[in-house]
Amino acid sequence: MAMTELLNAEDIKKAIGAFAAAESFDHKKFFQMVGLKKKSTEDVKKVFHILDKDKSGFIEEEELGFILKGFSPDARDLSVKETKTLMAAGDKDGDGKIGADEFSTLVSES
């Protein structure tokens, strides 16, 4: 499934552009801009599974660094600092990875 089957391509493009500068990523604003915040829990979990590149059932820190590329292949990677900030916000149980339920919570808190 492509991300554009769940989210509007123009919204994705605008959101990626808004956070093109290094160290500018704000997951709350990003999730709102791409329209993820308005989606059902089921659709948010579909987005999670697209972002879970290795299909482990979790988004690990390495995958998290490439989260923007999951929305648009030409997007930038997150910096180490941005990645760690996002992991800290999303990893509710402290196991070093974000599960589908944790991702849904992260989006709903945006």
UniProtKB/Swiss-Prot annotation:
Question: Anything further noted?
Answer: This parvalbumin has an isoelectric point of 5.50.
UniProt KW keywords: Acetylation, Calcium, Metal-binding, Muscle protein, Phosphoprotein, Repeat
Q: Which family does it belong to?
A: Belongs to the parvalbumin family.
Q: Sorted alphabetically, which Pfam families does this protein's record hold?
A: EF-hand_7 (PF13499)
Official protein name in the record: Parvalbumin alpha
Per its database record, what is this protein's job?
Answer: In muscle, parvalbumin is thought to be involved in relaxation after contraction. It binds two calcium ions.
Q: Which residues form the EF-hand domain?
A: 39-74, 78-110
Gene3D superfamilies, per the entry: EF-hand (1.10.238.10)
Q: Positions modified as Phosphoserine?
A: S24
Disulfide bridge positions per record: none
- Origin, by domain of life? Eukaryota
GO cellular component terms, A-Z: cytoplasm
Under InterPro entries, the record lists: EF-hand-dom_pair, EF_Hand_1_Ca_BS, EF_hand_dom, Parvalbumin
Domain remark in the UniProt entry: AB domain, comprising of helices A and B, is involved in structural stabilization, protecting the hydrophobic core of the protein. It is required for high-affinity binding of Ca(2+) and for Mg(2+)-binding.
Q: Which GO terms describe its molecular function?
A: calcium ion binding
Q: Which residues are recorded as modified (N-acetylalanine)?
A: A2
Q: Which residues bind Ca(2+) 1?
A: D52, D54, S56, F58, E60, E63
Q: Where does Ca(2+) 2 bind?
A: D91, D93, D95, K97, E102
